[in-house]
Amino acid sequence: MKSLRSSFMLFLGLSLSLLFTFAALATRNPIQPSAAAPKYHTHFVYYDVQKMTTTTLFTIEGEWHAPNWTPDGRYIVSDQGDDLYRIPVSGADKGKPEKINVSQKMAATNDHALSWDGKQIAITSLAAPNRTPTGLHNVILIMNMDGSAAHEVHLGWLHGWSPNDKYLVYAQDQEGNFDIYRVDSDGSGELRMTTGKGRDDGPEFSADGKWVYFCSDRSGKFDGWRMPADGAGPGDKLVEKVTSGGDTQDWFPHISPDGKWLYTISYPMDHPDHSYIGDGMKIKMLRLQNGVGAKGAKLTTVRTFFGGQGSGNTGGWSPDSKKFAWTEYETIPEKLN
């Protein structure tokens, strides 16, 4: 019995010793919640149309999307996480993001565009619960460039403003089909612009305000199309194909302000769904003649890279039409602890 009691006391002593040791270690090295390290470095890249060269403007940690050049050429507006930022493109603060403090709760998406006068930002936010039957909650907000006076305008996946800043154009699945819509910037006067089968997406106005360019798979794969600014008409008879052929799914045709060039964000042919992120993404360009590809002209690849839809789903042209920007991703190797 004495031996059993001694054994028990020895076991108890060892247990308490181990407990105090672990407690001391925990106090000295407390376990912290692990912050998720950014998955990517993002390279902000631009193509110089005249020099036909590609240059990395700057690199930032994290996954950044859809660079929009401000009309004065001094900043790029981009999103990361739930927030919007403006980033100086030159000077001592080049490449240092400045958060835009939005006056309303917002969960940013990469669907954002600047008004042509440079005074406002429109963006699709996901922070609007119970607003759509699909549960996507994609509401368009308009705000001043500093984030003030943010207010809801309409539901939709925003892609652009009209040159007079009167209208917004966006894509939305409202009647069982993804189509292009236009609405006044105050949220009134919605106009359904396309009604054809297939997915229509990525609408943008031409600088003269006469046309809306968009991408569609209505011909079997994604290509660039355009229609008059008042819509495609009955049966979409007024749509006109702008790009064709090729070995890629060509999304989001972005028209230069001078109307001479178009570039696309192009996916590998076996990835028609634009949620893809990976290798084989391409930037393609087309010289325009009267708003469409010149006779015999085809999209030309200027860059192949690791990226995705957020690399440039809204326009990245500089105001002088000399260059355009997009984002490329570089995977950050996992650190072994």
Regions found by a protein language model. Name each.
Residues P71-D72, W116-D117, P163-N164, A207-D208, ...:
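Residue-level detector of Asp-centered blade-edge/turn motifs that repeat once per structural unit
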Residues I76, I121, D165-L168, V212, ...:
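Hydrophobic beta-strand positions that form the internal "hydrophobic ladder"
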Residues V49-Q50, V89-D93, N144-S148, D184-S188, ...:
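Short loop/turn segments that connect beta-strands within beta-propeller blades
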